[in-house]
């Protein structure tokens, strides 16, 4: 009988949920969902100095925001330390591990000598078969795996293919430190085994760990999970991803105004492909996802592509849902509290009314919020530098005439105000643009905005006439 698929996402809570971690979680989640399995979440919090509760909260919140739901309770690695020690003692009792009493100075000398001789194996195995009675009385030993001295360790990786290590180049890795704390290598293997993990999908920076971890599996007689080491994400120039490229936490993308669906869609295409298809619903991702379609080359992060995709998702979203997303965004941006204080039933209704024009221009929710600023602006409006340049004495006089022409418009709609302004322009011998731009500056404080007649309709008669009066000569 085939075992049900179980994947896991196992971040270390030493900071935010990195964008690469978000993609790893997504790949694990998609694969499990495709095959009707489970994705588990394990917090690898054994580094007690660097692991923090805020970092754990950021990881959980980031996954939820991305729409990645894990199955069952979250597993905390540190809480399982007794089980990890139990396995180390089992290996010791079976003669597959040994106590090492090498001092820090001796280990440093071994490493220096190995490096000088160009050897990758840094520990010389001096305590491998040595009589423990020779150990210093006050020395707390580490426990090391008695790794095979010859032959090969082989991983049949679903992404990288067949990967082979010569055992003569691999150290007897430490399982338990001198203070009795388990190492990462041991903890990961024990946890994956006990959690019935069938597939380990993680970054290819863990590939060397796979060789060492397989040796622990072999020593315990446990079945090795299927391994899939996915390529890392690089910057557009092919260099290691940095903050200027986009090496940020998922929370930063949230604050920059990216939609979770857009970020999910973008991340799934980093390193994985399905023909020429670029845009996927969540169900389409689940149906199409396959480990065999993940490439070996590092994926390149492209902000412009992400922005374009995000713009597509904004345009496809219904207006009310975008207002809800904007309200959520207010918790994460500096200007959020001030705008939140201005949110009323009236301004929410104005946002919904303005949204068809707003969303055509915006690539992020931040841009959407910025372009909607005219709705929340206090009178008299702050006019930006470009707008100030427009407001010459002659233009201010024109604004007064435009206000007069609009006073009797009824009903007040985009169509009726446009008709009034076209009539005014014709009678004054002006092009419509010469009328629209002064209106735009007077009503929004800027030289760019959604369609000016949409702005007139959204703000309503009283507010428009008041704003025009503020700027008229």
From Swiss-Prot:
GO terms for molecular function: ATP binding; glutamate-tRNA ligase activity; tRNA binding; zinc ion binding. PROSITE patterns: AA_TRNA_LIGASE_I. It holds the Pfam family tRNA-synt_1c. The keyword Methyltransferase does not apply. One of its GO terms (cellular component) is cytosol. A motif ('HIGH' region) lies at residues 11-21. ATP binds at residue 243. Disulfide bonds: none annotated. One of its GO terms (biological process) is glutamyl-tRNA aminoacylation. Keywords: Aminoacyl-tRNA synthetase, ATP-binding, Cytoplasm, Ligase, Nucleotide-binding, Protein biosynthesis. The keyword Nucleotide-binding applies. It catalyses: tRNA(Glu) + L-glutamate + ATP = L-glutamyl-tRNA(Glu) + AMP + diphosphate. It is found in: Cytoplasm. Catalyzes the attachment of glutamate to tRNA(Glu) in a two-step reaction: glutamate is first activated by ATP to form Glu-AMP and then transferred to the acceptor end of tRNA(Glu). This is Glutamate--tRNA ligase. The lineage of its organism: Bacteria, Pseudomonadati, Pseudomonadota, Alphaproteobacteria, Hyphomicrobiales. The gene is gltX.
């Amino acid at each position: 009988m085939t075992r049900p698929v179980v994947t896991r996402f196992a971040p270390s809570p030493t900071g935010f949920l990195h964008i690469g971690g978000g993609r790893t979680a997504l790949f694990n989640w998609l694969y499990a969902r495709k095959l009707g399995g489970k994705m588990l979440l394990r917090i690898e919090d054994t580094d007690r100095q660097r692991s923090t509760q805020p970092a754990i909260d950021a990881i959980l919140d980031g996954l939820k925001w991305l729409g990645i739901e894990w199955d069952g309770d979250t597993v905390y690695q540190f809480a399982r330390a007794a089980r990890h020690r139990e396995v180390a003692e089992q290996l010791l009792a079976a003669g597959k591990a040994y106590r090492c009493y090498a001092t820090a100075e001796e280990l440093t000398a071994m490493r220096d000598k190995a490096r000088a001789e160009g050897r990758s194996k840094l520990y010389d195995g001096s305590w491998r078969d040595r009589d423990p009675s020779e150990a210093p009385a006050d020395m707390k030993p580490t426990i090391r795996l008695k790794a095979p001295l010859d032959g090969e360790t082989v991983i049949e990786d679903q992404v990288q293919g067949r990967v082979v290590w010569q055992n003569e180049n691999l150290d007897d890795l430490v399982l338990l430190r001198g203070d009795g704390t388990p190492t990462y290598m041991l903890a990961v293997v024990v946890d994956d085994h006990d959690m019935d993990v069938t597939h380990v999908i993680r970054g290819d920076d863990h590939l060397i760990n796979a060789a060492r971890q397989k040796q622990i599996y072999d020593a315990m007689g446990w079945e090795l999970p299927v391994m899939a080491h996915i390529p890392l994400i690089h910057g557009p120039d092919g260099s290691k991803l940095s903050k200027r490229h986009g090496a940020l936490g998922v929370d930063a993308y949230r604050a920059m105004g990216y939609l979770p669906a857009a970020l999910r869609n973008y991340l799934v295409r980093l390193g994985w492909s399905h023909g020429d298809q670029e845009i996927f619903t969540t169900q389409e991702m689940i149906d199409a996802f396959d480990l065999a379609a993940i490439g070996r080359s590092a994926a390149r992060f492209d902000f412009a592509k992400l922005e374009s995709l995000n713009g597509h998702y904004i345009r496809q979203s219904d207006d009310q849902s975008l207002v809800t997303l904007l309200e959520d965004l207010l918790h994460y941006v500096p200007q959020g509290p001030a705008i939140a204080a201005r949110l009323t039933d009236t301004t929410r209704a104005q946002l919904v009314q303005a949204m068809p024009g707003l969303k055509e221009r915006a690539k992020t929710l931040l841009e959407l919020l910025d372009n909607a600023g005219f709705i929340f602006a206090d009178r008299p409006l702050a006019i930006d530098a470009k707008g100030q340049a427009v407001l010459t004495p002659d233009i201010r006089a024109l604004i007064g005439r435009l206000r007069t022409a609009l006073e009797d418009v009824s009903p007040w709609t985009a169509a009726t105000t446009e008709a009034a302004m076209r009539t005014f322009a014709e009678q004054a011998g002006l092009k419509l643009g010469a009328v629209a731009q002064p209106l735009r500056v007077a009503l929004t404080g800027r030289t760019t905005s959604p369609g000016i007649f949409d702005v007139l309709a959204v703000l309503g008669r009283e507010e428009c006439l008041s704003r025009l009066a503020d700027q008229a000569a």
